């Protein structure tokens, strides 16, 4: 009986200490993933910002729609775009948040797919309008028309393509 009890205690100690090291590894791995996601988002943001214009694709029923945009912003660790709530694009995104962005810079282009989520908080709208002050002529953080949307974390795939280099795929 004593031997069985000693064995059980030793086994429990090994299991518990093993679990602790697994948790430490998992926490370190999660931090690494978070950092990689952050770097991928920043690289995506920088590419689109330098391209100046990107094209946003949405769907209305079975009909795709594409239009040019110019707003891209990082706020609270998320990648945001902006539009007017009264526009068809807003209605399409509220009905189906799946979207794709394409931008071209020199001989490279980026495709970003993901799910866009409406963020109606004043802080998010104000942050976007601070980065794009020229929009303050048409929009306000306090109006009912300004709409900012962020890419839902974990749904985003960004691929940078080039005629000269292999594609670079990033997820965040």
Question: For the regions a protein language model found, what residue spans apply to each?
Answer:
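Short, basic/aromatic recognition patches
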Residues: 33, 37-49
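C-terminal motif of bacterial Sec signal peptides marking the signal peptidase cleavage site
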Residues: 15-18
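Charged, gly/pro-rich active-site loop segments
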Residues: 22-36, 111-172
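Positively charged n-region of N-terminal signal peptides that target proteins for export
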Residues: 1-4
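A short, Trp-centered hydrophobic/proline-enriched beta-strand micro-motif
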Residues: 46-61, 99-103
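A short mixed-secondary-structure module that forms the rim of ligand-binding clefts
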Residues: 72-106
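Hydrophobic residues embedded in beta-strands of well-ordered beta-sheets
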Residues: 64, 78-79, 156
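A mature extracytoplasmic/lumenal domain signature
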Residues: 60, 85, 105, 116, ...
